[in-house]
């Protein structure tokens, strides 16, 4: 009896080995690599009419999501009013913005009060300032008095490390749950960053953060206007599903903040598990979100960093590092 069990196990093992080798040979003949990823990919989407009005009443079946050109099944669908917000407000305090800081502080205060005065009780905001260095003036909180106190201490000096600010703000957001948003208030120019605009965008996409940019008091004469900085802000905003407001002069800053809050209250969360997605040597997966109604337009991030052919690919730290003199500094 014991010998018959050993023989049965032997022939079972041979059949298993033959099937495994056969499957391996078939896989080796396939030129394209596909993988079913167990990691949920989250996409925040904003939908508007052709006239620019936000639409927050669509159903799951009215969305289509494509990963590297392959349509995916939407596994998670939520209206964003139920999702907690973590908002990083990045205020440019370089020398070129000094004259506008008082108005920016007042408008930012109104933004914080409107943001945290309604919505999810777990919503929180943090205040960062940036010139040649980035300072965390106020960590994530719901304490409006603490935020207002820090806003009043802002003063302008030195250069502008805008890309470094976005990168480090994204790193602060990465471990947090729920929706993540970076709002950048600046005059659009970057003069001293160690990171590039592409590295800043990559950090935001890795953190699942949406970027909104508000350009304050741009020069109306194109000959002296920093259009390169404005284009970079628009590049980062559109790549994460956000918006860039141009220009923002006087009361238009308040209008921009109001528009941001309106969008945040009417967004959708779409989630999918990547399936049958062709992999290549680039970690970046191209995303496309569509709505079935031709009279509507959708904004969402244009991609995410996932698996590559042959494995997961390197860590973000393999491509981007923080140099010692650009470390984020906390306000004491």
Where do the PLM segments sit?
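Bacterial N-terminal signal peptides that target proteins for export
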Residues: 2-20
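Hydrophobic h-region of N-terminal signal peptides that target proteins for export
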Residues: 19-28
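Scaffold/interface architecture of coatomer-like assemblies
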Residues: 28-332
């Amino acid at each position: 009896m014991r010998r018959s069990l050993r023989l049965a196990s032997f022939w079972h093992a041979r059949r298993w080995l033959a099937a495994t080798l056969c499957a391996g040979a078939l896989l080796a003949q396939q030129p394209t690599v596909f993988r079913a990823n167990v990691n949920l990919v989250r996409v925040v989407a904003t939908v508007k009419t052709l006239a620019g009005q936000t639409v927050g009443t669509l159903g799951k079946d009215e969305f289509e999501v494509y990963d590297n050109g392959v349509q995916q099944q939407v596994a998670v669908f939520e209206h964003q009013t139920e999702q907690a917000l973590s908002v990083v407000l990045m205020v440019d305090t370089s020398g070129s913005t000094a004259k506008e800081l008082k108005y920016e502080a007042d408008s930012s205060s109104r933004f914080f009060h409107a943001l945290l005065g309604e919505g999810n009780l777990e919503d929180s905001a943090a205040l960062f300032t940036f010139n040649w260095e980035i300072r965390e003036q106020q960590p994530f909180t719901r304490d409006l008095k603490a935020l207002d106190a820090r806003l009043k201490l802002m003063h302008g000096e030195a250069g502008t490390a805008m890309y470094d600010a976005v990168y480090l703000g994204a790193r602060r957001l990465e471990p947090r749950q729920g929706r993540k948003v970076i709002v950048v208030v600046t005059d659009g120019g970057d003069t001293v960053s160690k990171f590039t605009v592409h590295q800043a965008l990559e950090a935001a996409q890795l953190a699942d953060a949406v970027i909104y940019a508000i350009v304050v008091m741009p020069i109306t004469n194109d000959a002296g206007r920093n259009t390169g900085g404005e284009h970079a802000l628009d590049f980062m905003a559109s790549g994460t599903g956000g918006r860039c407001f141009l220009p923002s002069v006087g009361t238009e800053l308040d209008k921009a903040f109001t528009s941001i809050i309106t969008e945040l209250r009417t967004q959708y969360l779409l989630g999918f598990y990547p399936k049958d997605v062709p992999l290549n040597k680039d970690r970046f997966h191209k995303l496309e979100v569509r709505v079935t109604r031709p009279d509507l337009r959708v904004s969402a991030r244009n991609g995410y960093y996932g698996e590559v052919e042959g494995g997961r690919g390197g860590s973000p730290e393999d491509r981007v590092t923080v140099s010692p003199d650009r470390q984020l500094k906390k306000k004491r």
